[in-house]
Design a protein with these regions (language model features):
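N-terminal pre-domains immediately preceding structured catalytic cores
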Residues: 1-129, 133-152
Length: 152
């Protein structure tokens, strides 16, 4: 099905595909159409939404347009896409209460104009990521502010 959509959008199919299932709170990694691994994830506490400031996880086709965090230790905390020099367990109790962005950032860009690209529905401009979390115990249940959270 996604191949038809890609063709309609004038995009090329990729050998690697990440399929987020919000209902099941799972992220599946496919290679050449075959499932390699299924990961537990957490999407937004809010209903799915592509609209800015909704804090909902966007739907539709996306691409990973930026990878941040290569070489950083597991649990490294990022603020503004920059490592702060501390892993989550080293942060204050107050800071650890927040959903921190940890380990890596895969920044997403929508591929569907008017759905998740452009105007008030632009995933890239909303800074929606796939990233690690300091609250791994919540994986499998909606708990983010729009991003897809995964284990470190």
């Amino acid at each position: 099905m996604y191949e038809k959509k890609l063709s309609f959008l004038g995009c090329q199919a990729s050998e690697h595909l990440l399929l987020a299932d919000i209902d099941q709170q799972q992220l599946e990694h496919l290679f050449q159409g075959r499932s390699l691994k299924v990961y537990k994830m957490s999407s937004s506490k809010q209903p799915p939404s592509c609209v800015e400031n909704s804090l909902g996880t966007p739907w539709g086709l996306h691409e990973v347009c930026q990878k941040i965090g290569e070489g950083q230790p597991s649990g490294m905390v990022f603020e503004g896409r920059v490592p702060i020099g501390a892993i989550a367990s080293e942060c204050s109790d107050e800071k650890q209460k927040k959903n921190l962005i940890t380990s890596r950032i895969l920044r997403l860009a929508g591929l569907e104009k008017g759905v998740n690209q452009g105007g008030v529905v632009d995933t890239f401009e909303r800074y929606v990521y796939i990233h690690g979390t300091n609250h791994e115990q919540n994986l499998g249940s909606p708990s983010s502010s729009g991003c897809l959270q995964m284990s470190n």
